[in-house]
Amino acid sequence: MPSVVGNLVVQNSNGSFNLGDFYNVSPKENTKAYNGSGASNVGFVVNTFNGVSATNTFDSDVADQDQIGTA
């Protein structure tokens, strides 16, 4: 099942996106999040008592961890 694809931009995808025939599906994901004090707490009842908090978002490197695809 051959297919011809022009310009394709996927902003956000969960799962896999297949075009045409495929042999091996290996989805990859990169995520970076900056959370302040108590920002990523999860649960039914969460009580946080935070004073003054500052999050450093300066990132001097180009890539944190490259994902290299293998065929």
From Swiss-Prot:
Q: Which domain of life is it from?
A: Bacteria
Q: Does the keyword Ion transport apply?
A: no
Which GO biological-process labels does this protein carry?
sporulation resulting in formation of a cellular spore
Record key words, sorted: Germination, Sporulation
Q: Which Pfam families match?
A: gerPA
Q: What induces it?
A: Expression is sigma K-dependent and negatively regulated by GerE.
InterPro entries in the record, alphabetically? Spore_germination_GerPA
Q: Does Glycoprotein show up as a keyword for this record?
A: no
* Protein's job: Required for the formation of functionally normal spores. Could be involved in the establishment of normal spore coat structure and/or permeability, which allows the access of germinants to their receptor.
Q: Could you say which protein family the record assigns here?
A: Belongs to the GerPA/GerPF family.
Name of the protein this chain belongs to: Probable spore germination protein GerPF
**Species:** Bacillus cereus
